[in-house]
Structure formats: structure tokens, C-alpha cells
Amino acid sequence: MSDLQPWQWPEPTWRELVGRARAGRSLKPAAWPNGARCAVAISFDADHETIPLRDNDPSPMRISQGQYGNRQAMPRILKLLERESIPTTFFYPAVAALLHPEEVRAVVADGHEIGIHSWIHEANTTLPREAER
């Protein structure tokens, strides 16, 4: 298998790999609350400027692309979620939360959940084990 690329793996190989990670029992309830036919989970990654910072590319163009989320998208998203009474989770890299504390306060004030999304959106698959700890 080591000589093959993932797209070249035979079906038993990828089925076995995926099977290792499968959760145990089904979490689907016998009936959803209020007669609903399904459940939906909505979350947002509020990465903002952390991707270009992580990539060591603090060019004004890349930073301004990251700022779009805070300046334009987030107010619209919060307004939509409030109008539709949709609770959600916003995942923030710590650096993004430190750069935009007023946004984090607004998210919390609207009753949404905050989740941590790394320090600066590290590419954790490339980190040495000791750095990841």
C-alpha cells in the first residue's frame, strides 16, 4: 500500500481504514422532538486573518480578505440567525478572538456557543508531535 496513492487503493483498503474510525452505535433517536424528520447542526469557522498569518503572508490583500468575515459577513450572519432563531456554534482560533473581542461578545450575547479552533489555525498535520502537545 505504501507505493500507492490513496486514489489507487483497492476498495478493501479504504473501507478498512474508514472502518477503524466509525463510531459505535447509531445516535439516531427513535423519534425526533416535535415531529421533526431530522436534525441539523450549523457551525461557522471564524478564522478571519489567521490563515494568512499562519502562512506568514501578511500582505494587505490576504489580510483584507480575512477581515471580510469580521467586517461584512459576521453582522449579516448574526442578523440571519437571530431572525430565524437558529442557535449555532462559532469556532475561533484564539488569535482571531483576540483580534475581534467585540465580535466574540456579540456572538455570546446572541446566545451562540464559542468553540476553540486552535491558536492561529496551525496546520496541525504538519506539526511535530512535541509542538502539537
Task: Please annotate each region the language model reported.
Residues 2-133:
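Catalytic alpha-helical scaffold of carbohydrate-active enzymes acting on polysaccharides/glycoconjugates
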